[in-house]
């Protein structure tokens, strides 16, 4: 990984104004098919794009980068592909976490990791522990994650508090639920990028992207490079975020 010198992020936002980027990394399989290879080949190529994206984010003032690596629906893929993805996950943790740590990146895995085998769960625990004190980019890997699952697990936590008598139902509001979903302690997601040409969210961060800008590109994930990332940030910088409001001075919209 080619990262800059480690230092805490500045309080001053970068020119693009984007603090938290989330990426739906789509197109590995189609990329592999174009090369006449099996899908696992595309996933390995996609891992190189992850390195580029992490490096770019860390070097360009982004506070948090969230990558959709494995959805809760991906278990429905062929068993051979799922197995290859799990092995790639273990390999990536083993090969990259020390580099992430050296470059002050904090790694977090969001999702229901209980379904993973004990070997992968242990790798996740050690990787998160190693980087927990880092103050640079926060890299969130969404693994066995679904936006609906995230909301449900948050609601269950609140329901348990009500059942225990520690919370009244009428005390529950959006902010309270927000404190019980993944990444609640981070800046809200500003920008969602989806590669691969599809124009849908695919059950990703449904709560967290309520006011995010969406950016879709036909570029397949293994081909997504620094120039593509910069293009997405430039598009974001040129948008006017209204958060449900109207344009300044526009009383007719």
UniProtKB/Swiss-Prot annotation:
Binding locations of Mg(2+): 26, 199, 213
Amino-acid positions noted as binding substrate in the UniProt annotation, renumbered to this chain: 26-31, 39, 43, 71-73, 75, 77, 194, 200-202
Assigned GO CC terms: cytoplasm; cytosol
One annotated GO molecular function: magnesium ion binding
Keyword field: Cell cycle, Cell division, Cell shape, Cell wall biogenesis/degradation, Magnesium, Metal-binding, Peptidoglycan synthesis, Transferase
One GO process term, biological-process aspect: cell wall organization
Effect upon mutating residue 149 to F: Decrease in affinity for IPP
CC cofactor note: Binds 2 magnesium ions per subunit.
Cofactor: Mg(2+)
InterPro entries hit by this protein: UPP_synth-like, UPP_synth-like_CS, UPP_synth-like_sf
Chain positions of site Required for continued chain elongation: 69
Listed EC numbers: 2.5.1.31
Effect of residue 137 to A: Formation predominantly of a C(70) polymer rather than the C(55) polymer
Pfam family, one: Prenyltransf
Residue numbers marked as site, Important for determining product length: 137
Binding site for isopentenyl diphosphate: 213
Domain of life where this protein originates: Bacteria
PANTHER family (UniProt xref): DEHYDRODOLICHYL DIPHOSPHATE SYNTHASE 2, DEHYDRODOLICHYL DIPHOSPHATE SYNTHASE FAMILY MEMBER
Function: Generates ditrans,octacis-undecaprenyl pyrophosphate (UPP) from isopentenyl pyrophosphate (IPP) and farnesyl diphosphate (FPP). UPP is the precursor of glycosyl carrier lipid in the biosynthesis of bacterial cell wall polysaccharide components such as peptidoglycan and lipopolysaccharide.
Subunit (UniProt): Homodimer.
Record protein name field: Ditrans,polycis-undecaprenyl-diphosphate synthase ((2E,6E)-farnesyl-diphosphate specific)
Source organism (scientific name): Escherichia coli (strain K12)
